[in-house]
């Protein structure tokens, strides 16, 4: 088996270096994919820096992969995938397939522990491997250069829309207009929802309106927030910093839900009466299942929803990562493989 070229962090916080590794024999259930494009997500930086305490080095990050099938394991031969087919791989590379969560179609919550693509050797490489279930066929008309971020950032904000049965008549608010929030706005606009963006940066207003928001509200203006009481069926939080959440809880209509995908480290303080009085709820989620990923990619292709991206050659990966670290990305960075 030939070696795979990649870019790896050799230590926590280190710059990425060229690294070759032996992938071993192809597992029966695995698919090997040639990488064409791979997005950079803040989770990649967290893993490179070992923020979560379980990174293993050398670490090959990257989990927003667009590529082509180059090999199929013996148990992946008749699963609807073909050599040469365009596919995507997101945050998860493996799940056990036999626990209650997997059998019920909730593989992302695999009781044996769904294996992140990064822990499996990720997409900052010429090739990578994943279980066939997590290799997502792509529609022919999807824009492959910008599609990678849909496989992590996109599914992260699409999942709540499925969970809470959002329709064209829903009124939805989005807190934070960054890599996640801007995709949420585009998806909601494509669905026909009434979309309100909450942003602390007034300079973004015209750009956010052009993405499909119906209204932009200054999240630092208490009076503007107070005026929205009782309006929203769903508010999605995409930021990972602590805010005064009470005005957002009060902005929910009866039966409304506050859903966080932003990993806020401090506890959310929710007065019980705020929830009880209007049948309101608070929830959260991470990414999605293979089925949900397929639904997202089909919807994005049909509706022409594409993340706003900046393209770097993979050979300039350290420059691209620094660009993300500096908060300069508009709004997601994608690497083009050039091995």
Swiss-Prot record:
Uses: This enzyme can be applied to the microbial production of fatty alcohols that have numerous applications as fuels, fragrances, emollients, food additives, and detergents. Thus, together with complementing enzymes, the broad substrate specificity of Ahr opens the road for direct and tailored enzyme-catalyzed conversion of lipids into user-ready chemical commodities.
Record field: temperature dependence: Optimum temperature is 37-50 degrees Celsius using butyraldehyde as substrate.
InterPro entries the record matches: ADH-like_C, ADH-like_N, ADH_Zn_CS, CAD-like, D-isomer_DH_CS1, GroES-like_sf, NAD(P)-bd_dom_sf, PKS_ER
Cofactor(s) recorded in Swiss-Prot or TrEMBL: Zn(2+)
Top-level taxon of origin: Bacteria
Listed GO MF terms: alcohol dehydrogenase (NADP+) activity; oxidoreductase activity, acting on the CH-OH group of donors, NAD or NADP as acceptor; protein homodimerization activity; zinc ion binding
GO biological process, one term: fatty acid metabolic process
Classification via SUPFAM superfamilies: GroES-like, NAD(P)-binding Rossmann-fold domains
Enzyme class: oxidoreductase
Pfam families listed in its UniProt record: ADH_N (PF08240), ADH_zinc_N (PF00107)
Official protein name in the record: Aldehyde reductase Ahr
Gene that encodes it: ahr
């Amino acid at each position: 088996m030939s070696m795979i070229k990649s870019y790896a962090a050799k230590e926590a916080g280190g710059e990425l270096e060229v690294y070759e590794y032996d992938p071993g024999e192809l597992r029966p259930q695995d698919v090997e994919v040639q990488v064409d494009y791979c997005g950079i997500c803040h989770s990649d930086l967290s893993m490179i820096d070992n923020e979560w305490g379980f990174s293993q080095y050398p670490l090959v990050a990257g989990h927003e992969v667009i590529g082509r099938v180059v090999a199929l394991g013996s148990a992946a031969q008749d699963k609807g995938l073909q050599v040469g087919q365009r596919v995507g791989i997101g945050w998860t590379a493996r799940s056990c397939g036999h626990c209650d969560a997997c059998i019920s179609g909730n593989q992302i919550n695999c009781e044996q522990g769904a294996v992140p693509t990064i822990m499996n050797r990720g997409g900052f490489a010429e090739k990578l491997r994943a279980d066939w279930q997590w290799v997502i066929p792509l529609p022919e008309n999807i824009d492959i250069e910008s599609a990678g971020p849909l496989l992590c950032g996109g599914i992260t904000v699409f999942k709540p829309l499925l969970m809470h049965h959002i329709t064209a008549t829903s009124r939805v608010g989005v807190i934070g207009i960054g890599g996640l929030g801007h995709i949420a706005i585009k998806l909601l606009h494509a669905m026909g929802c009434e979309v309100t963006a909450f942003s602390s940066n007034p300079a973004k207003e015209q750009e956010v309106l052009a993405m499909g928001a119906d209204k932009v509200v200054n999240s630092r203006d208490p009076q503007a927030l107070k005026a929205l009481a009782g309006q929203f069926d769903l508010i999605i939080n995409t930021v990972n910093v602590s805010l005064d959440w009470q005005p957002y809880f009060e902005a929910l209509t009866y039966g409304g839900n506050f859903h966080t995908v932003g990993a806020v480290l401090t506890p959310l303080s929710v007065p019980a009466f705020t929830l009880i009085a209007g049948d309101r709820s608070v929830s959260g989620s991470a990414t999605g299942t293979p089925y949900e990923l397929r639904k997202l990619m089909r919807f994005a292709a049909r509706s022409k929803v594409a993340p706003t991206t900046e393209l770097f050659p993979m050979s300039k990966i350290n420059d691209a990562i620094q660009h993300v670290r500096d908060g300069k990305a508009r709004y997601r960075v994608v690497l083009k493989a050039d091995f």
